[in-house]
């Protein structure tokens, strides 16, 4: 089928659908919901059999859904209606939630239901649930609906007006989730912050200054006078509740153009007087050992790795190499493996160019340490999405194991033609081949694990229980005890020596950084403009041609909607 994805942004769900539908042979193009007239134009250009709207903030124009079937993904179970479905679900602590695929008609969220999925809720940020459970269920539901439409099934009947499942909820506002520090329990505080995490952030005050709170975690073995800030750890601040405390990892001031940054950095002067309490529930980096398997786990907010994060992870990596293990797992968090350098920290720096340079060198140091590890096998375990330098950092390991639910974005160019580093010019061609490496980095499209496996970017695809910590350790132990381990390690050492003799790692780094220096310090400001627009969420004025295939002028005879092959 020829399918148009109509979305407010090319977010994680839209990317997953783009990948999964193309993988199944559909002709997919994307249009960002910029204006009703632009939507009409995109329908005229692409001539879709079906429009799918994974993420909208307004209704599809009447004349569009009347002329072509439009499916809307609603982040709630059948009968739920309103613009803040997931916010309310997280805030109210429901045990189960769902996602519904319905056909657009004259009433918002009230059209015929083609499919739906349910999932158990966990105590987590709204953005994390959206990126994981909701996205996985939405993809399954959309694919079911598409298959039914392809099979010629008639549209289901809409819910009857008196159906008891119908519940219309308005926006979830600040007043609905304001924290009462003198009465709210730790779990209540977490639900309130989690319900606004991602966007818009929960407004509260710290040190008598209003900020938006993000990245909340339950604190362990810490308590104090409710409402007071009592400790710090790895950039987070602990604030006491009536029955414990919560860690606040990131905050954002209310002033225009403020940035979301580590809480202890925003309030550095105040935090200077607070005790450090490591091991109390906030730990972006952890190391555990299981016999011959070491596991270095890391989880940075939104996958962004600041200079200090890279240096801390490198220190932990070097410490892990001192341990007598045969296999080392580098396990990323449930939301992201890594998205590379920390653009918000760079934007906040006195010199964005200088901080960009420090950050890229810090992540390069980490990548090089992994590449040069020859006394054991290293595995990158990707359980959440990865982008840009984060993808190439994972390739520094001997093997890459990835969840079947993730999306990879192995390219940099969307960030103002950024060239990239992390030794990608060595690592990517070594796995995918030179021609594929060029195509991947130029196409700038999201990649699913099926394609990544075909290109040898991913070595093993994992799902379900195989992603649990115990299963990962078991897989690592099997690798460590394999009869061919010694031979494999020797082959690794020989290949590294041969590669170094052919072209030293330093040469790759020098060449990459020469190009990056132009991005950071050169006359072309594209990187700095793109970074600013990304960090401040400046709305796009048009859909990038890399995903809007219907807007590319094509040679005669070439299908209008065919996206660039990846």
Swiss-Prot record:
GO terms for biological process: biosynthetic process. This is Hydrogenase maturation factor HoxX. GO terms for molecular function: catalytic activity. Involved in the post-translational processing of the hydrogenase large subunit. It comes from Bradyrhizobium diazoefficiens (strain JCM 10833 / BCRC 13528 / IAM 13628 / NBRC 14792 / USDA 110). Disulfide bonds: none annotated. Signal peptide: none annotated.
